Amino acid sequence: MHSKTAPRFLVFLLLTLLLLLAASPVASKGCVCKGKGQCLCAGTKGEKGEKGVPGSPGFPGQKGFPGPEGLPGPQGPKGSPGLPGLTGPKGIRGITGLPGFAGPPGLPGLPGHPGPRGLAGLPGCNGSKGEQGFPGFPGTPGYAGLPGPDGLKGQKGEPAQGEDRGFNGKGDPGPPGVPGFQGFPGLPGFPGPAGPPGPPGFFGLPGAMGPRGPKGHMGDSVIGQKGERGMKGLTGPPGPPGTVIFTLTQPYNKSDFKGEKGDEGERGEPGPPGPSGPPGDSYGSEKGAPGEPGPRGKPGKDGAPGFPGTEGAKGNRGFPGLRGEAGIKGRKGDIGPPGFPGPTEYYDAYLEKGERGMPGLPGPKGARGPQGPSGPPGVPGSPGLSRPGLRGPIGWPGLKGSKGERGPPGKDTVGPPGPLGCPGSPGPPGPPGPPGCPGDIVFKCSPGEHGMPGDTGPPGVPGLDGPKGEPGSPCTECHCFPGPPGVPGFPGLDGIKGIPGGRGVPGLKGNPGSPGSAGLPGFAGFPGDQGHPGLKGDKGDTPLPWGQVGNPGDPGLRGLPGRKGFDGTPGGPGAKGPPGPQGEPALSGRKGDQGPPGPPGFPGPPGPAGPAGPPGYGPQGEPGPKGAQGVPGVLGPPGEAGLKGEPSTSTPDLGPPGPPGPPGQAGPRGLPGLPGPVGKCDPGLPGPDGEPGIPEAGCPGPPGPKGNQGFPGTKGSPGCPGEMGKPGRPGEPGIPGAKGEPSVGRPGKPGKPGFPGERGNAGENGDIGLPGLPGLPGTPGRGGLDGPPGDPGQPGSPGAKGSPGRCIPGPRGTQGLPGLNGLKGQPGRRGDTGPKGDPGIPGMDRSGVPGDPGPPGTPGCPGEMGPPGQKGYPGAPGFPGPPGEKGEVGMMGYPGTTGPPGLPGKPGSQGQRGSLGIPGMKGEKGRPGAKGERGEKGKPGPSQTTLLKGDKGEPGLKGFVGNPGEKGNRGNPGLPGPKGLEGLPGLPGPPGPRGDTGSRGNPGRPGPHGMPGSMGIMGVPGPKGRKGTSGLPGLAGRPGLTGIHGPQGDKGEPGYSEGARPGPPGPKGDPGLPGDKGKKGERGVPGPPGQSGPAGPDGAPGSPGSPGHPGKPGPAGDLGLKGQKGFPGPPGSTGPPGPPGLPGLPGPMGMRGDQGRDGIPGPPGEKGETGLLGAYPGPKGSPGVPGAKGDRGVPGLSGLPGRKGVMGDVGPQGPPGTAGLPGPPGLPGAIIPGPKGDRGLPGLRGNPGEPGPPGPPGPIGKGIKGDKGFMGPPGPKGLPGTVGDMGPPGFPGAPGTPGLPGVRGDPGFPGFPGIKGEKGNPGFLGPIGHPGPVGPKGPPGPRGKPGTLKVISLPGSPGPPGVPGQPGMKGDPGPLGLPGIPGPCGPRGKPGKDGKPGTPGPAGTKGNKGLKGQQGPPGLDGLPGLKGNPGDRGTPATGTRMRGFIFTRHSQTTAIPSCPEGTQPLYSGFSLLFVQGNKRAHGQDLGTLGSCLQRFTTMPFLFCNINNVCNFASRNDYSYWLSTPALMPMDMAPISGRALEPYISRCTVCEGPAMAIAVHSQTTAIPPCPQDWVSLWKGFSFIMFTSAGSEGAGQALASPGSCLEEFRASPFIECHGRGTCNYYSNSYSFWLASLNPERMFRKPIPSTVKAGDLEKIISRCQVCMKKRH
């Protein structure tokens, strides 16, 4: 019934019941009798009665059946949101997702390297013979053949007729010769003069893209700064319609629905600050425990710009920049200056023209050979022709002549103009000229023609002689012809300047030459030696009248003391003195002993002067030492004024000049003169070529024009050190550039010299400038005459370290005469640094008492050249040496260096005040100052109107530990707790005392059925046991499980089986038991108890704690009442094992055990004996493996010729034919652009372009990130945060007091299966089982190796099968062939498939008894035997010397460290810390010998790839080495070459008798070595290091390498494959810190420690070695 009809049906029932009830009383009123007797009222229906009173409500009916399901009601209003649920526990890790879809195909890879060449293919079959081809085209005429060999030598000709005049007679002209071969191209001529400049060319097309650059530096894996906020994006498309959720608070009205949510509006302006909220609820007055540090907050807003920071340290290497665009092509260069004319060739007319020879190969220019020995004297030549001879060289200047007679008076005062002087040396650069007018814009022109060749360079130093060549083979038939000349070679490099040859033997005297032309006047000669005194001269002419006497001069300096005069004559007796006082009367004593000699008496008064003695003639005494500076004399009275002189009346006519006086002494150096005007130098007519002057005496010529670029010369030998350059002027401070990578720039081109400037006023003495750059090495000068000794110069930089000289002091020689001054030697090479001494014991702070002077030491080796000392006082003049021999006149020396300034003159009078000086140049930027003190706290900044939520502040420091609370009173006993959980097993108690040995036990009862044992772990094969006694024959075992497939044994002989037929298949095995539950991990060691904290607030009741350990026994209480019966006690500790009991009865047979693991495959069995013939045929064999393909047979004989076949398929493409004849010209092709060609190879590298125009100004660079700003004021209170994650579990509570043992509970549920028990002893042998069913047929075994067959001829391996061809038409049968040669035996085929079973054969006869079988496998292990008696005492072990325990010690200096006492060195080397290749680091343990490489290089490794290619130092890999305390250079430039040696630490590998370990204290105290260990060294605990790309490695703390003897914040240096090393700011070292033991298990306090206090926070350590006993 439908649900709609159910209510109608109920209404119908109710109406029916009401009608029935209403009808019953109406029926009794229908018939009324009114006294007329009995009426029969049957059948009359009365009227309808009145409506009755409604009856009382009936009882409720029975509960009806549930009606059908009603219609779904309307959706109710949404309920109010529920309270947020608690955060659920962390979910279980989800199942690993399905593998993702395959990604889009990657970009095509770069083409791989060409693979290695494949193996040669197998030789193909011989093809069939082809048909005869068409005749070929006639070939092109061949090249002319080589000339044939020379013909036989002709007969000797007749003698020529001619006159013997020294000329060869010239014959008649011969017949015209055969035209010669075409000559080979001659050497290229000299370049012609430059043509006129061409018109400007068009701009060239841009060049092809260059090859990919080398791999850049590895970037550091650092996170970049947060980028700037991007611009607001465009409004996105409208999203999908959202779900509207709202809460009805009033009757539902459809009109209350809102439309869809509009797009998100633009961000509004910040609103005004809201009113301050009500105070929050207080949840307890106590401050909570500090929370865990929160997650990292969002990055803060940019603060106000700070003050400019100081210049930062050098930054890390940046990422490699993007590749720049190609620069604009440079402008066309200027036309080069014209070159010098080429060498002049002279034509000698007297040479006879020879026959035309074959052109020879032009040989390369050989190196200049050494001077040969002088040849024998030649035959005297015939008299020379009277041609003018070459001008001889200018002779040496003659000696100074004696003084000539007085010459006649000169005629003119002014002489004729002298010859044109040499051009002066270039003056100092002049001031910069005014800016020029702007130049015209010129188009870029193509580069000009090459200029003329430049001057020929000086000849180079001769190269070293090559090794001696192999002796050539003797020439047997030398009919060789010179080959055609090759292409002319490049001109050879100029040879190195040769060593001057020895003096040659004087040649024979030549014929007298014709007189030469007048030579140039010679240079002024050097002053000659002082002549002997001349004869007395004639009386001189009357001098001119004397001048007036001048004013008296200033008193001179005090003179040197004079020589000691001769003794004067003794003076006369002195005058009589006055009478003395009266003496006391003397006692008459006896004569005394002679007294000692008295002291010398005082000098008497000086006597009167004696008469003058005769002049002394003693030898001249040595001048005394220079006296001390005298006291300046008293200023004398001013002298009287002299008379005014008469005016001079002399006329300008001078008298005749007097004789030249003797050369005066050199006057003091005058002031520098003013520069003269620039002289005009009209060029004179060119004179004849002069002869070469004295070598190196002429003035240097003007610089020649720039020559063409020569071929690169060989590397020259190092030049002599140049003079120290003058200090350069300080440059203008440049704008600070962006931080660049250190690079090596190319040297700039030298500028042109400026015009000479006027001499400026002398400035004040400036500070000493930085040393200038070293000058270019000068050409070494010839030795000049010794100048006067100069004052010591400025201290020079120390010379390069020389190699250590061998210093063996010889016997002392006699004093030699003073030698001549030798030439200055080259500075010696730097000696090796001596080894570093062992560190001494630290001395006390006080200085000790000075010791006695030691004995004089042996003279030491000469030390290194120190820096020149300060200027010393002038020394005393030395003894005059004997006159040297007269030397040869030296070459004209170069002008000497400027002498030192003279002694200061007396101070002049004060000059007038000078004019105002030019303002000085801007000083260089000072070094950044030291970091200032922290400033006072600033005022609060202006309030921000937008009160956005501030960033989360950094966690505050941990508060101090509070004082411990007072001890509380003892509490009342608590209520008994609920029944505790089952406790964890307690810790094992201490072992009890050993029990008495038990008596021998009774035999045990049979045990219960054991559980099936679990499978044991496969044991290690034990050692081979002794051979046991022969056991009784065992019962037949069960058939074993199928083993792993062993290797296929040799094929046995065909066996026999007696009537075994396959049984039915066995039942399916039992399902295996569930796997074991894993073992519970061991309990960790309890930590030490922490300090008691202050009492916290009452916590919520905790969850029931884990039962505690049993407490210690308390004090004895009062005797209690007798207790109830106690609970059973815990089991006692296990006693000692009793004697073994009697063997128990055998238990019932256990259940079937699990299947054991597969056994280790056994070795292949030996070949069995041939079985006897069986009675029944065996079962059907397994199908054999198909046999290998047989060898190819010998080809058969040829058959009869077949019929002509149908035309076959088109054959493969034939080889290319010969070139055809040229065809007729084709029609003009259509102009269709072809497809774009492949990309060409990258072009050759072009010449560098000229510099482009300056680019536009770059963007304004951002400054370096400033220091962290000061902490701002606290932000407004943040909104309440979301509920945090569930905190970590708290620390375990203190152990509770142990509860009373509970009443024994109900038996628990069955427990989990227990931990897997140990393997039980093997059970006794069970009864023999029934034979098992035959297992299923196994898979066929692997194919056996082919047997060895002796074949007659080994056929080649067959090639791979070709593609099957189309079947051809069937040909006619050929003729019968001859029988073929039998082929070699093929290899044995694989066994064929099993044949169908044959019919059973007849029963065989009974076989003989089989041979004795081989020894069976060893039986089960027996029970362990009884304990044996103790053995005899062994011999004591012998000690050894060194056991080969290796460790490495690093000095962290350039000294090689010594091995500690008791160890010996193996080798020394350089300290390698770690390497980094392909951005991955690999470290070395500094305690092992792998960290001590015997050779140092900045790139000690290379890398190889799968293409058999290895690359060395060709990409950006690194190596890191322990470094020394040497400071890095001031300019932070990378270090390379020999300059690296002072930066690399040395190391020694040592061998000791025992193991070496490192012990770390984690404090600043040095830890002691363990007992019976000795100390090797002490140091600092080094644990880890990182550098480029945050890659690095670490040290094992047990290794001696973790204990470095010296602490450095930067203990290692970074080196690169390009040969440079440096320290970089991203290198970090990690050390163990020193810890306060009271701070364990607490939050570490952050701190920063600066240099000077670093050793106070580093853990100390000691390396120890076990003692030898």
Curated annotation (Swiss-Prot):
Give residue spans, biased composition: Pro residues.
105-114, 188-200, 416-437, 596-617, 654-665, 1128-1146, 1250-1259, 1333-1343
The protein's PTM annotation reads:
Prolines at the third position of the tripeptide repeating unit (G-X-Y) are hydroxylated in some or all of the chains. Type IV collagens contain numerous cysteine residues which are involved in inter- and intramolecular disulfide bonding. 12 of these, located in the NC1 domain, are conserved in all known type IV collagens.
Q: Where is this region: Disordered?
A: 44-473, 500-1439
Q: In which tissues is it expressed?
A: Highly expressed in kidney and lung. Detected at lower levels in heart, muscle and skin.
Signal peptide (UniProt feature, chain positions): 1-28
Q: Could you tell me where the Basic and acidic residues compositional bias lies?
A: 255-269, 922-939
The record's region (Required for the anti-angiogenic activity of tumstatin) falls at: 1478-1556
S-Lysyl-methionine sulfilimine (Lys-Met) (interchain with M-1532) crosslink residues? K1650
Phenotype on deletion? Answer: Mice exhibit normal pregnancy and wound healing, but consistent with the human hereditary disorder Alport syndrome they develop a progressive glomerulonephritis with microhematuria and proteinuria.
Report the glycosylation sites. Answer: N126, N253
| Compositionally skewed regions (Low complexity) per UniProt | 54-68, 202-211, 279-290, 382-393, 551-560, 666-684, 861-876, 970-985, 1092-1103, 1228-1248, 1366-1379, 1402-1429
Q: What is the location of the S-Lysyl-methionine sulfilimine (Met-Lys) (interchain with K-1650) cross-link? A: M1532
Q: Which GO terms describe its biological process?
A: cell adhesion; cell surface receptor signaling pathway; collagen-activated tyrosine kinase receptor signaling pathway; endothelial cell apoptotic process; glomerular basement membrane development; negative regulation of angiogenesis; negative regulation of vascular endothelial cell proliferation
Q: Where is this region: Required for the anti-tumor cell activity of tumstatin?
A: 1609-1627
By its UniProt entry, which InterPro entries does this protein fall under?
A: Collagen (IPR008160), Collagen_IV_NC (IPR001442), Collagen_IV_NC_sf (IPR036954), Collagen_superfamily (IPR050149), CTDL_fold (IPR016187)
User: Where are the disulfide bridges?
Assistant: C1459-C1550, C1492-C1547, C1504-C1510, C1569-C1664, C1603-C1661, C1615-C1621
Residue numbers spanned by region Triple-helical region: 43-1436
Q: Where is the composition biased (Gly residues)?
A: 778-787
Keyword field: Basement membrane, Cell adhesion, Collagen, Disulfide bond, Extracellular matrix, Glycoprotein, Phosphoprotein, Repeat, Secreted, Signal
Residue ranges constituting the Collagen IV NC1 domain according to the UniProt record:
1444-1668
Q: What is known of its domains?
A: Alpha chains of type IV collagen have a non-collagenous domain (NC1) at their C-terminus, frequent interruptions of the G-X-Y repeats in the long central triple-helical domain (which may cause flexibility in the triple helix), and a short N-terminal triple-helical 7S domain.
What is the stated purpose of this protein? Answer: Type IV collagen is the major structural component of glomerular basement membranes (GBM), forming a 'chicken-wire' meshwork together with laminins, proteoglycans and entactin/nidogen.
The UniProt similarity line reads: Belongs to the type IV collagen family.
Name the chain's protein: Collagen alpha-3(IV) chain
In which organism is this protein found?
Answer: Mus musculus (Mouse)
Q: Which gene encodes it?
A: Col4a3
